[in-house]
Amino acid sequence: MTLNNLQALLRRVAAREDSGHVVVYGMGNTKAFKSYSYQDLLRVAIKASVALRKTSDLHPGSVILLHFDNHWDNIVWFWAASFAGCLPAISASFSNDASQRTAHIERLSTTLMHPLCLTNERIMADFAGQDAVQPLAVETLVLNGDVSFEALPQEHPEPSLSDDALLLFTSGSSGNSKGVCLSHGQILASISGKYAVRPLPDNTSFLNWVGLDHVAAIVEIHLQAMYALKTQVHVPAADILSSPATFLQLLEKHRVSRTFAPNFFLAKLRDLLQENDSLPEPRRWDLRSLEYVASGGEANVTKTCDRLSEYLVAFGAPKDVIVPGFGMTETCAGSIFNTRCPEYDKSRSAEFASVGTCMPGISMRVTDLSNNALPSGEIGHLQLTGPVVFKRYFNNTSATQEAFTPDGWFKTGDMGCIDENGCLTLTGRAKENMIINGVNHSPHEIETALDKIPGLTPSYSCCFSFFPSGGETEEICVVYLPTYSPDDLAARAQTADAISKTVLMSTGSRPHVLPLEREALPKSSLGKLSRAKIKAAYEKGEYATYQNANNELMRRYRESTRAEPQNDLEKTLLEVFTRSLSITDDAFDVKTPIFDVGINSVELIRLKRDIEDHLGMAASAIPMIMLMTHSTVRDLATALEKLQGPREYDPVVTLQSHGHKNPLWLVHPGAGEVLVFINLAQYIVDRPVYALRARGFNDGEQPFETIEEATASYYNGIRSRQPHGPYALAGYCYGSMLAFEVAKMLESHGEEVRFLGSFNLPPHIKMRMRELDWKECLLHLAYFLDLVSQERSREMSVELAGLSHDEILDSVIQNANMERYAELSLNRPLLVRWADVAYELHRMAFDYDPAGCVAGMDVFFSIPLAIAAASKTEWRNVHLSQWEDFTRTVPKFHDVAGEHYSMIGPDHVFSFQKTLRKALDERGM
C-alpha cells in the first residue's frame, strides 16, 4: 500500500489485526497501564474529529494548538485534528515563571494566528493571567457513536505528500521558538529512513518517555512504531527520571527493541548498574530484545557509552546497542546515526562519541562561512539537505530565508567535522542557545528575568552553559556584578538564592552562581558583555579566585545562620531532604534553599517522590511548583501543615496565596464546598484568593444553625487574614446572600467593601429555599458534582418521592458516574454528610428576608434555572434587578456565558475570569 499521507498510515496499521497496540502509563503508576489497539485509536480519533468539526470558527487548514499533560490525549487529538483537515501544533509544557509563560503564550497566539487551543480541564490554569489564547477543555466536546472513516464528511481533499502534517516548536518554554512545518512526505521519508538503519526483531515494541511535543516522541517512536507494525509504550518522564530502574523494568516487561536516552540519563543508568553490581545478589534484567537505544540532544561521553554497554551486554543486549546520533525538529529527530559506538570512538581515543553517518533521505556537508564545502577533518558549519529536511517555518518568512543557503542547504547552527570515514563529530554551536539535559534554552530570556533581581546590576549579568570536566551534561553558569557591598553576606546569599530559583524555574537546572567585580565584566564599545569571552575565561579558570572567595563567604554565612527543626514535620522533612539529595547535615538546614546544594530537575523529581512516600501521600499530592517555590524545609513544612495537621474547622481555604493586590474572598454556593472555585482561582494571579467553606464537613462538626452564626464565622475568618479593607467579596448562588450579609457586617465596623459580587442570585430567595427538602438538596448536589446529568436528576426527583433517606441515597449512588464518584473520593458517609450540610444551609434561609444596604454590587448573570425564570432577560430585569433596593449605588450587571450550574465550570471559566478581573479593575481593586 503506497502511503500518501499520515492518515493512510493509521488506516493501514488499523486494518491489520497483528499490528500492535498503544500502551499508556499514567503518572505515578508504572505497575498498571491501558492498552489500545490501532483500531481503537482510529475509532476514537474519528469520533473526536467529528466533534471538532462542530466547533465554531474551525475550517480546513486551521491550526489547532494541543496543550496536554499526558501522552494519550496528545495522540488522540493529534489524529483528530488531522482527520478534521486541520494542522495540529503540539505545545511544550509552559515555564513555571509566570512572566515567561505569559510572554510565550502571547507569542504562540501571534505566530499561529490566534489558533483554537485544546487542553484538559485540570491544566486550564496554565493559561491564567493572559487573554491571547482561550483554551477549550476537550472534556466539554461530545464524542458520540462510532463513525467510520468512509462516513466522514469529505469537506476537504486528502492531504498530499507536500502538505503540512504537523507543527512542532524549536525550543521549550523559553526563547522565541519557531513553528517547524513538517510535511506528510517529510515525515514518511524520515520514518522509512530511520527504520532502514537497523532491523528490529519481531514481537517487540518501542518505548517513549518524553512528551509528544518532542519530535523524537511523535516521529521516532509513535509514527515509526506504526510504520514498523509494532506496539509502542508511553511512560511519563517523571516516572523514568526519578527511577532509572523503572526504565530497565519496562524494557524487559514490554520486550522493547527501540527506545532513546540522552547522555545524562545514560549516566544515571550506568551509576545504577554500577551500584547494582556491588550488591550481594545483583538484580538482572532480560534485555535480549533490546537492539537500539538512540541517544542525542547533547554530547555523548565515550566512557559512559562504553561502561553502560558492558552492563547491557551482560543482560543480553548487543555491544553496539547505544546509538549516538544527531537530529533536530527540522529533520524529524534523529537523521545521522553512529551504529558502531563505542568501539569506533574508542579506536580513535575520542572523548565524545561521533554522531555517525546519514540515514537514507538526508545528506550533510561541513562548510566555511561562504558555504564552501570543507575537506574531511576540518571544522566548519554543519548543513543538511534531502527529503527529510523541512522546507519552512510557520508564518516566519525571514527565519525561513535565514535558515537556508542560496543553494538550498539547511544551516543547522552546529559546528563539526566529517572524518575520513564519513562520520560526523560535533564540536560546538555557532548559536548561543544552551542545551541542558537535551533541551534548548535561551540565555537572553534568562538574563532578562535576572535583571529584575535587586542584588544584580542591570545589564551586568551573563548566562552561559559549559561542559564540566568529567560531567555527563552541560551545566549553567551565571556571573553578575553585585549591587551589595562585598561584606554583606546576607545580601550575597539572598541574591544567589534568587538567581538559583529563577534559573531553575526556567530550565529545571540549578546554576553555578558567581559574583564578579566590574573589571572582570568588560563591555564592548556598544555596551555589551561578550558571552563567548566570559565563558572562555570561566572555563580557563580565570575566575577561580572569585569562586574560592565566594564559596568561603557563603559557607561562613550558612554556618552562622544555621537553623534547627522546630517541630516533628520539619525534622522529618530534613531527614528526607538530606537522604534523598545525599548531603550532610552540616551543609544543609531547615532554612537552606535546595537550589544551593546543586539539585537538578531529576533530583527534584526524586525528592518530591521521596517526601510523598515518607509522608504516606499519593504520588501527585505535592505539586512540583510547591517544591520549587517553597525551597526550604521550613517553607515546605508550612505549606504542608494543612495536609499534616488536625482537621479543626476554619472557614478560610487558601486557593491562591500570591499577588500584590488585595485578596478576593469567595463564598461557597449552596453545597457548602469550595471546589467549584478552584479553576477560577488559578486564573487570578495578581492577588491572593480565599474561599469560605461551610461548617459540618469534618468529623465532629455541626452545620451552622443560623445565618447570623455563619456570617459571624466568615467575618472573623476574613478579618483574621485581612484585618482591614478595602475588601473584595463575591458569592456563588446561595453564597451571594452570605457575601451580602458579611459585607454589611464589615461596613458596620467601619471597613470599606469596594467590590461585592453576586454570581447569579437575586436578593429574595426564601420561597426557593423552602422548595428544597433533603432529597432535592442531594439531587442538586449530585448534579452539581457531575455525578448525574441535569435531566436524570429531574427524573429522579419524581421517582424518589416519598422514599426514605437511605433509599434515596441508594438510588443516587446506583445512578452516579462511578468514575467521577471515585475521582472526588466520595463514599456513602461523606455523601450523606455533604447532603446534610447543604440541607441545613438551605433550611436556615427558609425565612430569610434581605434588609439594609451596601455601597454597591456587581451582579454576574447567566441563563437561570428553568424553575427560576422563563428567560435570561426576565431573570435580569425582574429578579436580579431587585438588588437595587439594597445598594446605595446602582448595581453593575455583567452578562456571562453558560447556565446557572456551569457559568464558572470548565466550559466558561476562561471567559468568566476575564469579566471578573475587568469588574475588579473598574472598582479600583
Swiss-Prot record:
One Pfam assignment: PP-binding
Residue ranges, annotated region (Thioesterase (TE) domain): 663-909
PROSITE patterns, sorted: AMP_BINDING, CARRIER
GO biological process entries: fatty acid biosynthetic process
EC number(s) on file: 2.3.1.-
Disruption phenotype: Abolishes the production of aspulvinone E in hyphae, but not in conidia.
Keyword Zinc in record: no
Tissue: ApvA specifically produces aspulvinone E in hyphea, in contrast to melA which produces aspulvinone E in conidia where it is converted to UV-protective Asp-melanin.
Annotated spans, Adenylation (A) domain: 15-436
Keyword tRNA processing: no
Modified-residue entries (O-(pantetheine 4'-phosphoryl)serine), positions: 601
Domain Carrier: 564-644
Family assignment from sequence similarity: Belongs to the NRP synthetase family.
The record's note on its domains: ApvA has an A-T-TE domain architecture. The adenylation (A) domain recognizes and activates the aryl acid substrates, and loads them onto the thiolation (T) domain. The thioesterase (TE) domain shares the missing condensation (C) domain function, and is responsible for condensation and final product release.
UniProt name for this protein: Nonribosomal peptide synthetase apvA
Protein source organism: Aspergillus terreus (strain NIH 2624 / FGSC A1156)
Name of the encoding gene: apvA
